[in-house]
């Protein structure tokens, strides 16, 4: 495959693209080519559809029209568009969290018998952080108060959002408060963005962007809350060994992919699938093989060792194997095309949420009150599909990688405690100080069809690891790295610099692994970016410095979704240099671009690094880490 035509660096995906071409199946890459040339006004953020006088578009070269019909400038139009993306992303993550809050509430009230408190320790830790009394209280009563506190954080109230003010270092909360950036309520901030960006409201670009920063913290609250509540209900992840890539599918099994984001559905599917093995065998299968796609795949991977099939932009490839019997969907990052592809592959596509249906898919409404019954109904559809598929040819790439995952914040602290039980963070801090660990980089976000799949993630990670940067990853960024072997401990010698190698080996051996931790630590799904925040906040608190002084950076190397926009923005807002590897729709306004890549540093300490070349991006991330080290008086 010629380099200029490279669609994916994943060999399994390349094999399926060849199959799709032979069979005349249109994929996401074909649709991207058909869409070219894409609208330059949209790409630069210079189009506006916020009222019925439009659409308006601004000339990017300085000629007329220089303002919209209402008089909105390029700066205002670009800032409003960015704000709405942040709000949409926050709505996604916080909707996920709200779903979990309602599920926890139903569980402890006896209305959803399939769910229970799985992690009592995490429950008590969260309650203590929120100021909820636990002494002498029943776990169910504590959990109910946690659920109520979570739901209260969605509304405007006199007290600020707890899932912001109690999770960040006090020094960071002070900075954010001084600039009016602490959200009053998650839903409140989303609604206010929609209000202030409507026609006739906020027409000051800097003020609009400050509103966007505040709304992004509502997204952080949704992420952190989603992680907390999922851990209470389904357990806090601990290290687990599994596999990834299309090779995890099995020709002779009922192959079921859970796809989307919320473990409320996928965790039950995993549990019930074990009960239905005999039904699958009676249909002629060897059993039920549950695999994951995207973030709900990450959820069940890190808690149950469920293998990851594929991620993000390549989700259609699982179906093109011909071996996928059912794709079970909840919400977010699901391409509507899966229903069309299913017509070619025979896969049964099953939607489960009232707010996320797809024309052509089978809908089974999933209710927590009837979770087991709904799961059985869904899995029987998969078994029926297998009966129709049995005996037909399939093409499953013989490609898969070993994955060691499940590195929640608690798991990392526990691993470090084997080196220093009294002060678990000290070994990490000592190795940052002595240079064995140069800094930390969080890889987050999606794949984007505009970038050869996984290329940016793997190129940047490879360079950072050689420079002794500790790499953690979430979401489909984690998926990209796992499918290329970055989460296999056997690859530490090849991928890591000597200092990082020594640290990973010392921790692994202290924990009885007989070898190192993997080169990249998988911290979970996209909401689990909160785990990285928890880790760096603990480091900041331990050192007595704010987040904007730590040698910590983030990269959304192949960002696609509005949720990635929100995540990147709150990373900047809490003080992190944050790389974006695709062109964001802000370049139509030089002032907006300058604010986000430079001036915002004076407010939050963080800033965006927009760099499409992955080699150069790695250099810029290293430079940001070195600058932070110098600021702390550390050698680099």
Swiss-Prot record:
This is Carbon monoxide dehydrogenase 2. Homodimer. It comes from Carboxydothermus hydrogenoformans (strain ATCC BAA-161 / DSM 6008 / Z-2901). [4Fe-4S] cluster 2 binds at residues 48, 51, 56, 70. One of its GO terms (molecular function) is nickel cation binding. It is a peripheral membrane protein. Disulfide bonds: none annotated. Its EC number is 1.2.7.4. [4Fe-4S] cluster 1 binds at residues 39, 47. InterPro entries: CO_DH_a-bundle, CODH, HCP/CODH, Prismane-like_a/b-sand, Prismane-like_sf. GO terms for biological process: generation of precursor metabolites and energy; response to hydrogen peroxide. Cluster B is an all-cysteinyl-liganded 4Fe-4S cluster; cluster C is a mixed Ni-Fe-S cluster which is the active site of CO oxidation. Cluster D is also an all-cysteinyl-liganded 4Fe-4S cluster that bridges the two subunits of the CODH dimer.
């Amino acid at each position: 495959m010629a380099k200029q035509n490279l669609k994916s660096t994943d060999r399994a995906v390349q094999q399926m693209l060849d199959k799709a071409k032979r069979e005349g199946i249109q994929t996401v890459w074909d649709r991207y080519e058909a869409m070219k040339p894409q609208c330059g006004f949209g790409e630069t953020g210079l189009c506006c559809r916020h009222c019925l006088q439009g659409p308006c578009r601004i000339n990017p070269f300085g000629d007329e029209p220089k303002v919209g019909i209402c008089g909105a400038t390029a700066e205002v139009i670009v800032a409003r568009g960015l704000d709405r993306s942040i709000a949409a992303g926050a709505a996604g993550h916080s909707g996920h969290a709200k779903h979990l809050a309602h599920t926890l509430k139903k569980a402890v009230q006896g209305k959803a018998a399939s769910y229970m408190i799985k992690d009592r320790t995490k429950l008590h830790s969260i309650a203590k952080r929120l100021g909820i009394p636990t002494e002498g209280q029943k776990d169910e009563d504590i959990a109910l108060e946690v659920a109520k506190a979570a739901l209260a954080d969605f509304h405007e109230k006199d007290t600020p959002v707890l899932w912001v003010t109690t999770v960040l270092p006090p020094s960071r909360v002070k900075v954010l408060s001084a600039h009016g950036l602490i959200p009053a309520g998650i839903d409140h901030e989303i609604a206010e963005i929609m209000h202030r960006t409507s026609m006739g409201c906020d027409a000051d670009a800097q003020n609009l962007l400050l509103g966007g920063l505040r709304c992004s913290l509502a997204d952080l609250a949704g992420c952190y809350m989603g992680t907390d509540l999922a851990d209470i209900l389904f357990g806090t992840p601990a290290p687990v060994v599994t596999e990834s890539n299309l090779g995890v599918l099995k020709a002779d099994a009922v192959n079921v992919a859970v796809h989307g984001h919320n473990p409320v559905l996928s965790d039950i599917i995993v549990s019930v699938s074990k009960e239905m093995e005999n039904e699958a065998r009676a249909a002629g299968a060897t059993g039920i093989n549950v695999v994951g796609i995207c973030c709900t795949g990450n959820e069940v991977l890190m808690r149950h060792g469920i293998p990851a099939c594929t991620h993000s932009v390549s989700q259609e490839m699982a179906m093109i194997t011909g071996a996928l019997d059912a794709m079970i969907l909840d919400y977010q990052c699901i391409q509507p095309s899966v229903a069309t592809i299913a017509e070619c592959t025979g896969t049964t596509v099953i939607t489960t949420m009232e707010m996320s249906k797809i024309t052509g898919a089978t809908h089974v409404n999933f209710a927590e009150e009837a979770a087991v019954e709904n799961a059985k109904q869904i899995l029987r559809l998969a078994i029926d599909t297998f009966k129709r598929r049995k005996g037909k040819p399939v093409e499953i790439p013989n490609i898969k990688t070993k994955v060691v995952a499940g590195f929640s914040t608690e798991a990392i602290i526990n691993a470090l405690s084997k080196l220093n039980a009294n002060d678990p963070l000290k070994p990490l801090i000592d190795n940052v100080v002595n240079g064995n660990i140069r800094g930390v980089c969080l890889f987050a976000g999606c794949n984007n069809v505009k970038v050869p799949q996984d290329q940016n993630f793997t190129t940047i990670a490879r360079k950072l690891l050689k420079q002794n940067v500790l790499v953690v990853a979430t979401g489909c960024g984690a998926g990209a790295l796992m499918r290329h072997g970055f989460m296999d401990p056997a690859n530490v010698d090849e991928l890591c610099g000597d200092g990082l190698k020594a640290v990973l080996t010392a921790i692994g051996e202290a924990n009885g692994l007989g070898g190192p931790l993997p080169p990249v630590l998988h911290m979970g799904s996209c909401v689990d970016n909160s785990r990285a925040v928890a880790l760096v906040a603990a480091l900041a608190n331990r050192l007595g410095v704010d987040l904007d002084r730590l040698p910590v950076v983030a990269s959304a190397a192949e960002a696609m979704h509005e949720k990635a926009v929100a995540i990147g923005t709150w990373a900047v807002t809490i003080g992190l240099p944050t790389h974006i590897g695709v062109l964001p729709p802000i370049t139509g306004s030089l002032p907006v671009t300058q604010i986000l890549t430079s001036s915002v540093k004076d407010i939050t300490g963080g800033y965006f690094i927009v760099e499409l070349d992955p080699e150069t991006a790695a250099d810029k991330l290293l430079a940001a880490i070195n600058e932070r080290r110098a600021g702390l008086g550390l050698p680099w």
